[in-house]
């Protein structure tokens, strides 16, 4: 017995000295954190050592037997036993400590366990009575501190993490799916921050008190909201939530520029989440669910197509990888060749023949669609591909008319500006020039058809959405200029007609050569060189030229349909944006030198070899064409011997050329090259995104016939008009019937019995509806549940497949340490039991030996 106790004491002393030696070696330089006069008793030191290294038997024995132990004592870093046990992943020690009442720092231990991903320890801590009501999980450490509560405190100096970090936010930051799920079941949620420009009392007070902490708290909240773990587990529609959140974060990146990179990273994180969910789809039904939203309300038929609401939202928010994903593109391609499934697999030659056939027979196809819009041919024409071909062919014909309208002047001007030709001697010259030709009449019909199409688009999308698309602005500008041009031309024609009417009524001669006419009438007989600069016909011709240029530039709209020209069109658009950015600096430098050179030479008008810089207009022309090397150095030379002015002019002109040509133009070239490289590096995604935008404009119902065939209403249009009138009448009748029913119900409620019966019936119907809603999840919800399950499982597998890091090695080391103490305890118990057995055996055999010895002695005596 003495030998056994001696062995135990030697073993315990050896273990304790070894532990103290290890801790002393680690802690040595850090005793500076201790306050003066504070120290631990040997019992507390041993207790903290046992908790840190997972010595379960010692911790259990000290908690059960010691009367003087302070289990909330802290070490040199201010950590108590619970924090040390959690930090080293000792679940059994943590469970033993959580059984004690008035245990401190439970909240910090929870945050520590979440940050390290210790799920079982998190579950054990959440079962603590402190989290019974759930309020601890909804309040941030700062709010707890304001309530004079150090629940989340790391030590007396503050919290381990930021004051606004709640357990659910920390779990979301760490992408701990299981912990996030546990906290969500406990009722924890991440509150979405208020709008950046919110002026409520709470936001105003936080901004006034500490603007930096307010911004950081918003950033931490958005980091939690944008985490894949929180998005996938907290939202009923994770795809929609992620898309909207990505747009909000992108908007905040432009507002809070100090956190621009952080917000952009979070926005990209949301976009990657959406792409990851789409990548896990296994069949068409799941792809449709993501692209369209709730598939229960999507009807595939001849008259209805899926809404593609998620794709429209992704295009609006520029989630390019989502739109360019193969699953999304395959679905869009299927819809693009709707009712033309055989054409999809055909060669380019066959497709070209189909396009050529549509080009030749477009008028006949339009007539057939007017007569039978619901026939097989009508359904074929309503397919997106055929609508695209029809509109492209129509616009090509329109461009051809513009070319034909100018063909009479291709060989050069047949009449000089000072010459006039008329059909008969008494005809006024302007009547002949202002008449509309047959090509111009056709152009006007096309313009009216395009205006009607744009009006329908504005009616369907709304003015705000319409303005957001740059191509719509181009169409609006082009059509507006055409209308202004034709209006000015028509006004000139009216004035000329009035003059011709005056001549027909008041002039009796056969010719107008020797006739004295009033000035307002004689003006319309003059040749072009005598027209006023503000003449309506001159204005009309200038506007018409601008409209023609815009019309041909609109060809770029259909270029994304081709894989070769699509990236070039995207690069061109990006180049235009770069030029607009460059124009800010360009205009600033240009105006500075223009005003400076004008001030220098404005006093020398007529005293220069050319009029450069003598007026603002001449200064503009000289400096602008100097960029392209079309201005001469003689522009700064004076006829007088004013060398100082000339030298200043030479210097300014030279500095201007160096600044504009050498510096700024090369900077513009570098910007354009950089934009092109960005497009080229991700050309496939950029092109597919642009092509999807083009396709989507033809997926909507309506606008089947292109201009000008859309000006003639089809029988289908009359049918839809009648149906809309019918629906309006039905709604009106229902509203009247509902008002009568409400009056009747009010009469019923006057009776107590009827009132009770009415309320009971309403309650039963509401309960039945609620039960049906709760018991039957929608088809969309089932699909999203499957996809989110796959996403979570994939995320966990990817995380497990990562290389073993230093933290995991440390966890293994702590497990081995805890196992060592358990083995030592079992060994000690086994040694004690063996010593007891040996003692019992020795006692038993000792008695038997004594009896035999007595017998032998008695025998000798006898």
Curated annotation (Swiss-Prot):
Domain of life: Eukaryota
Topology in membrane: Multi-pass membrane protein
Segments of this protein annotated with the region Disordered: 1-21
Residue numbers carrying Phosphothreonine: 15
Residues of this chain annotated as glycosylated in UniProt: 514
Family annotation (NCBIfam families): trp
Name this protein carries in UniProt: Short transient receptor potential channel 7
Annotated source species: Homo sapiens
Gene: TRPC7
